Design a protein with these regions (language model features):
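Conserved A3 ("GATE") glycine/threonine-rich loop of ANL adenylate-forming enzymes
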Residues: 36
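Topogenic and prosegment regions of secretory-pathway hydrolases and membrane enzymes
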Residues: 3-7, 11, 15-33, 43, ...
Length: 305
């Protein structure tokens, strides 16, 4: 979802968050952009600016990283514009006190700075299907050409930036995981993506979440797990502590090598809104947090339908 609705309502009552939570409960992996409010007009870093539905704990909320025009990942950084956590939405309790969600977000980051994308055929604003961005900001196409785009007629490319550019990469990764293992539940997809993410140096949890998207590692971990998890859970035959590993499988080595560089996975996932969880048991044993119908944030637990 490329949505960034500004609002102050808690995920408990926010309409977009409730709709996303219902979709997750139905077995749909929901990916949302974090928003682009990580920097104030004066250039100061801003925390607590995650937008809805990215405020929803069950959603995979994605921030943007800057790959700096290189294939290697050691120089990647979180973009200045990418919204930082935690969520600051809330509600007024019956006793008059204000509840603030304070959910750890974003969940991870993906490339979202000057990424090449397709341009609509007609770039004239007055023409049908005109590409307003390309017309107003021709430098976006010039930047693509500088990256090597041939700019053939009807095949033009432009540079795009934003968490709305990063989120589709994670949505695609989630689809690849479900292709590799159709038995994954949405919370398990999220945990795998976080656990296998690459931590970026000099970035904290509220800037990068668990780290940068690592599809290679995520697929390896997904393939090591049973392919009947979602079905067994729906049938009521899977309970906390049951074996998650597929027959004859063991957990993969918790590192990846991409473009000649080896890095360790983050080996963390978010749970309960503000908790970090780790350890092999996250994926060797079934955890109740992998039930898509449950939402747990601090002292609140919801059964979603």
């Amino acid at each position: 979802l490329s949505l960034a609705a500004n609002g102050t309502d808690s995920f408990l009552v926010d309409p977009l968050a409730r709709a996303a939570r219902g979709a997750v409960a139905a077995g749909i992996v929901v990916v949302a952009s974090a928003s682009n409010a990580g920097k104030s007009d004066s250039g100061a870093e801003v925390y607590g600016a995650i937008s809805s539905p990215g405020i929803e704990p069950s959603v995979i909320t994605v921030g943007a990283a800057n790959p700096k025009y290189t294939a290697i990942r050691s120089d990647d950084v979180v973009t200045q514009f990418s919204s930082r956590g935690p969520t600051r939405s809330g509600l007024r309790l019956p006793n008059g006190k204000r509840w603030v969600d304070n959910v750890l977000k974003p969940d991870l980051v993906a490339p979202g700075n000057r990424v090449l994308g397709a341009v609509a055929n007609k770039k004239n604003m007055a023409a049908p299907n005109g590409n307003v961005l390309a017309t107003l900001y021709p430098s976006l196409m010039e930047g693509a050409q500088a990256q090597g785009a041939a700019q053939v007629v009807n095949e033009e490319l432009m540079e795009l930036s934003g968490t709305s550019v990063a989120a589709p990469a994670v949505a695609g990764a989630a689809a690849v995981l479900l292709q590799a293992n159709p038995g994954l539940t949405p919370p398990l997809v999220k945990a795998i993506l976080q656990y296998t993410a690459q931590p970026l140096p000099d970035a904290n949890l509220l800037q990068q979440g668990a780290g940068q998207l690592n599809v290679e590692g995520a697929v390896r971990l997904a393939k090591s797990l049973r392919t009947d998890i979602a079905g067994a859970l729906a049938a009521g035959t899977l309970k906390p502590g049951d074996d998650l590993l597929a027959a004859g499988q063991s957990l993969p080595v918790a590192s990846s090598t991409l473009n000649g560089q080896t890095f360790d996975w983050s080996r963390i996932a978010f749970a309960g809104g503000s908790h970090l969880v780790s350890g092999n048991a996250l994926f060797t044993d079934f955890q109740w947090i992998y039930d898509p119908g449950l939402t747990w944030v601090r002292r609140i637990a919801l059964r979603n339908t």
